[in-house]
């Protein structure tokens, strides 16, 4: 399974862009393989994201906003959930990945 981060490359909202960048930078820094899925370039991907975000995570009005994070077809969460997992040091669990153990250097 690959981590998929649904983003909007042409979002006019600075807050959304910053959240997307935060997720992508974290994954890159931790060498977690992921795929960016730009919902502004594919109506099919946008509809897939809207359909697969659980009802309890959908806003009362409108559609879910990026970034939305999936592990394959399994929904992981939105930015707020990602941020909470980052703060509590549980990102690997949030993403449905096995935690990596830091390797000790041999003396």
Curated annotation (Swiss-Prot):
Record-level Gene Ontology MF annotations: SH3 domain binding
Subcellular location: Nucleus
Keyword Nucleus: yes
Positions of short motif SH3-binding: 61-67
Domain of life of the organism encoding this protein: Eukaryota
GO CC, alphabetical: cytoplasm; nucleus
Alphabetized UniProt keyword annotations: Nucleus, SH3-binding
UniProt-listed InterPro entries: Glut_rich_SH3-bd, SH3BGR, Thioredoxin-like_sf
Family to which this protein belongs: Belongs to the SH3BGR family.
Protein name: SH3 domain-binding glutamic acid-rich-like protein 2
Gene: SH3BGRL2
